[in-house]
Amino acid sequence: MGKAEHTTGVKGAKAVDRQAAQAASDSPLTIALVVDTAGNEGNGTSNSALQYARELRRQGHVVRLVGIGSPDYPVAQRHVPLVSWVAAKQQMQFAQPDTEVFRKAFQGADVVHVYLPFAYGRAAVRTAHEMGIPATAGFHLQPENVLYSAGPLRYVPGASAFLYWLFNRMLYRHIRHIHTPSHMIAAQLRAHGYRQRLHVISNGYAPRFTPKQQREPGSPSPRPFMIVASGRLASEKDHATLIRAVALSRHAKDIELLICGTGPLQRELRHMAAELLPGRWSIGFHDNAQMPALLRSCDLLVHPSIVDIESLSVLEGMASGLVPVIAKSAQSAAGQFALTDRSLFDARDPVMLAQRIDWWIEHPDELSHWGAVYAEHTRQEYSIESCVREFVAMEREAIADFDGVL
């Protein structure tokens, strides 16, 4: 009898433990998101952080945004000679580490998630661990992107490998769970010696990007035919190839080109467009709030970028019902989104891109069909809701195996 009672007691205890574990797995988390620029949707990393924050809150979690421009936990900007000037042209700022703000923001948090490996992020992880709070990190800054912004330095042998090593040394070696937005960048981390637990989770797209109404079968190709591209106006985004391709198109006079973004090459790209393009064009910054309507008004999305960890702009375009035409590059993950070969062209090849553009202009029924296919595929595979649920699962795993050891 005693043995039976003891056995029943153990089973009861295990049942209670299982119930407690289940309750913990369903309970809302308090997550501190540490991103240098927390109040700016002009660059991809900040945009991703703000989208995740909104969806985390919608799913019932408590989010504390910590960074420049945060309404609740703001920090000062850190000025780095020359580097800050270049970064500002790409809507980026560096945050000043602030232990007092960190401690206030992290008090009572379940986990801290850091976006970038600079001094600000390193200080946040150090503070979290001192407070006994687990920290995770995202790998959102591709070393190849840094090198393209550094001019001739990108031609130095081994420069990219050095940056992968440096980022690991500065931050990621103190992290057990890393969020990578694509399999491509996860493979790069493995190739460069990262041994942490890698979680491949898309940045997702916001639900306000909804599909446009596709044209009825038999409708002629629209005039003007509006082509849109979105991204930093920097050399690695290679908008120059897009401008040359539009100039080579058989339908150049009927094309209206919109390149949405800001960056160091804005003046140069505008000068090139003025010289080469017979049709209308616009190159410059567009407020993020305007992008859903703008994308739905366009006919084709071109993404000529050579370097991308994922490319949120392609996701948003596909979700809006646009067919993408994407550069194939070993340093870009964006090609993973292509559902047909006619959505790909060889990077830096304006002739091939012009051929792709002409084919889609001359096949309006296929353009409408594939636009609807891309929109539905994106809704099923890359919704912010499903991506954030995977992110929360990663955070719960990090919390469960945290032992306080750096």
Where are the language model's segments positioned?
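Conserved donor-binding/catalytic core segment of Leloir-type glycosyltransferases
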Residues: 211, 218-247, 258
